[in-house]
Amino acid sequence: MIPIVIEESGRGERAFDIYSRLLRERIVFLGEPVTSDSANRIVAQLLFLEADDPDKDIFLYINSPGGSVYDGLGIFDTMQHVKPDIHTVCVGLAASMGAFLLCAGAKGKRSSLLHSRIMIHQPLGGARGQASDIRIQADEILFIKDKLNKELSDRTGQPIERIREDTDRDFYMSPSEAIEYGIIDNVFNKRPINSV
């Protein structure tokens, strides 16, 4: 069930679902696995907010176990495409594609709440069918793995060799460890007044 908020104004009361109300404050929330549905929603919201005000930052809050690499790359590319800076904030868990999107925020504007967890690993995949089909899928997974590792290396400043080694298996980090790694820039416990 999606919570409803009531807003009163001189023209009476108006009911909003919580996500629509957050969108008015330029807050986008990824609180589920990355799927085609969630990615399409987030891409649409980012494009809407850019059209609404291309000079005002957007805040992307992430609490996601990850999900579809292709759909996540659609969100990633849109984050890089839109003019406003994207602040990313981990609330709870940013794992797999969730961590990749957390790291994709504007430099200096990637954050985590104090007790969140961040996890990176290599893309998961499976294939079945004829040997040639399996080989095609394996080649695609290796291509995507290299692409994600290169982006992580570029955004964190870590050598590609370390990224390859650390993403070979699940690699969990606390927010302070994620700062040292270069995935985020700061950790906060309380939001400054008048800040989203």
Curated annotation (Swiss-Prot):
> Which reactions does this protein catalyse?
Hydrolysis of proteins to small peptides in the presence of ATP and magnesium. alpha-casein is the usual test substrate. In the absence of ATP, only oligopeptides shorter than five residues are hydrolyzed (such as succinyl-Leu-Tyr-|-NHMec, and Leu-Tyr-Leu-|-Tyr-Trp, in which cleavage of the -Tyr-|-Leu- and -Tyr-|-Trp bonds also occurs)
Q: Which SUPFAM superfamilies match?
A: ClpP/crotonase
Alphabetical list of InterPro entries matching this protein: ClpP, ClpP/crotonase-like_dom_sf, ClpP/TepA, ClpP_Ser_AS
Q: Where in the cell is it found?
A: Cytoplasm
Q: What is its main location?
A: cytoplasm
Q: Which GO terms describe its biological process?
A: protein quality control for misfolded or incompletely synthesized proteins
Q: Name one Pfam family in it.
A: CLP_protease
Gene Ontology MF term list: ATP-dependent peptidase activity; ATPase binding; serine-type endopeptidase activity
User: What family does the database annotate?
Assistant: Belongs to the peptidase S14 family.
- Official protein name in the record: ATP-dependent Clp protease proteolytic subunit 1
The record lists the organism as Prochlorococcus marinus (strain NATL2A)
Q: Which gene encodes it?
A: clpP1
